[in-house]
Regions:
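Extracellular glycan-recognition surfaces and repeat-rich motifs
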Residues: 52-82
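Bacterial N-terminal signal peptides
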Residues: 10-22
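Extracellular carbohydrate-recognition regions
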Residues: 28-61
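Short tryptophan-centered beta-strand motifs in secreted/extracellular beta-sheet-rich domains
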Residues: 48, 109-111, 165-182
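Secretory/extracellular carbohydrate-interaction modules
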Residues: 76-148
Length: 228
């Protein structure tokens, strides 16, 4: 019996499976793993193959879902047009802004995101873990910096975090302790200033992404666990 046609068919099937495989997380990534917690409950999982989850992302303005990616873009391209439309001179929607809401007091978050932007600009892009609280920024020479509110900063150049590249991020948090893993490079920080609680933020703990000028923010996978 000539087995060549069968082998050829099997090889073609395997190639099709590889090509069709999603670029984001697989089923294994929905399994709970943590260094800080023994167990957690998956409260949000999204690969952006459907509509926008407004419970976690809020208003759809400036947000589109294309090819399994959530894309966040500026609402306006010029200050004059924005001021005329909004009838104010602040919060003009000239940069992409995204919030992931309903963050538990103890959590594990795994997501993939990317800032598409020609270059770093002062204070941008900004990723806040807790609104105006813990800041995760990109170093100009590559890598990232964790800045605690009114506390110390920690630079981690080994993570290779950069603009225009997908960032694989894992964050584990409880009051006084946060673990940040970027592209497989991770550390745990214990400090009294490690908090996401902002008493001035009436919407509760959330993640805030701000891109600055000439920027789009892309997300392709999110997993959020509430921990005990």
């Amino acid at each position: 019996m000539n087995k060549a046609p069968i082998l050829t068919h099997l090889l073609r099937s395997l190639i099709c499976l590889v090509v069709a495989a999603p670029s984001g997380f697989g089923s294994e990534d929905s399994k709970f793993t943590s260094e800080l917690f023994k167990d957690g409950t998956l409260v949000y999982s999204d690969d952006f193959n459907g509509g926008l989850n407004r419970e976690f992302w809020g208003q759809p303005k400036g947000k589109t879902i294309e090819d399994g990616k959530l894309i966040v873009a500026p609402l306006f391209k010029s200050k004059e047009v924005a001021m005329k439309a909004l009838k104010r001179d602040h919060h003009l929607g000239l940069e992409p802004v995204a919030h992931i809401n309903r963050i538990p007091e103890k959590f594990v978050m795994h997501l993939r995101y990317k800032f598409e932007k020609p270059k770093l600009t002062p204070g941008r892009p900004s990723f806040q873990i807790g609104h105006h609280m813990i800041n995760l920024g990109i170093l100009e020479s590559g890598g990232h910096r964790v800045k605690l509110p009114d506390g110390p900063s920690f630079s981690e150049p080994e993570s290779e975090m950069a603009l225009n590249k997908w960032i694989d991020l894992l964050v584990e948090y409880e009051l006084g302790k946060i673990r940040v893993v970027v592209n497989g490079d991770g550390k745990t920080y214990e400090h009294e200033k490690a908090t996401i609680m902002n008493p001035k933020d009436k919407l509760g703990p959330r993640f805030t992404f701000k891109g600055g000028p000439e920027c789009k923010i892309l997300f392709d996978s999110v997993r959020l666990w509430k921990c005990n």
